[in-house]
A protein has these predicted regions:
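Substrate-recognition/cap helix-loop segment adjacent to the acidic, metal-dependent catalytic center
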Residues: 88, 103-130
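Conserved non-catalytic scaffold segment of RNase H-like nuclease domains
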Residues: 2-5, 10-99
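A ubiquitous, low-specificity "background" feature that marks scattered single residues
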Residues: 36, 74, 111, 138-141
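Short alpha-helix plus adjacent loop in nuclease-associated cores
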Residues: 126-141
Length: 141
């Protein structure tokens, strides 16, 4: 059985480390489209990270409500990623991450997994790293 973990992240800059992931949402579905669970969390900024000016300008002009929502119930990246890891491990194996744009979201999620979960996960919790939401037809889901 394949579990598709459809993820969406918001970040305050173009790359992890100098900037922070501010929120992560995911919904897990099987091949038939049955929802298996969902997850969402908002993160406190990384220590010494700073929001990128052009990213913050985009948020304030295009998605101010998303930016405000991301400031609610924030947790540390370590705590948040441990919660995400716990949730992922409840899902049936052969987990495939899906997102759009997949390379951007996967870069952030993988960096946070490697940085905050490497000590407790034996492997990245996705069988296939990712596919882009625009490629769904190719996967026949």
């Amino acid at each position: 059985m394949t579990t598709y973990v459809v993820c969406d992240i918001e970040a305050d800059g173009p790359i992890p480390g100098p900037h922070s992931m501010i929120s992560l949402g995911a919904v897990a579905v099987n091949r038939e489209g049955k929802e298996l669970g969902d997850f969402e969390i908002n993160f406190l900024p990384l220590e010494n990270a700073k929001p990128h000016p052009s990213t913050m300008k985009w948020f304030t002009t295009h998605a101010p409500e998303a930016l405000e929502l991301s400031k609610q119930n924030q947790v540390s990246p370590k705590e948040g990623m441990n919660k995400f890891g716990n949730w992922l491990l409840t899902l049936p194996k052969h987990r495939v991450m899906a997102a759009h744009p997949a390379p951007f979201d996967f870069m952030w999620i993988n960096w946070y997994i490697q940085t905050f979960l490497a000590d407790r996960l034996e492997e990245v919790p996705f069988t296939m790293p990712f596919f882009d939401g625009r490629d769904q037809a190719a996967f026949d889901i």
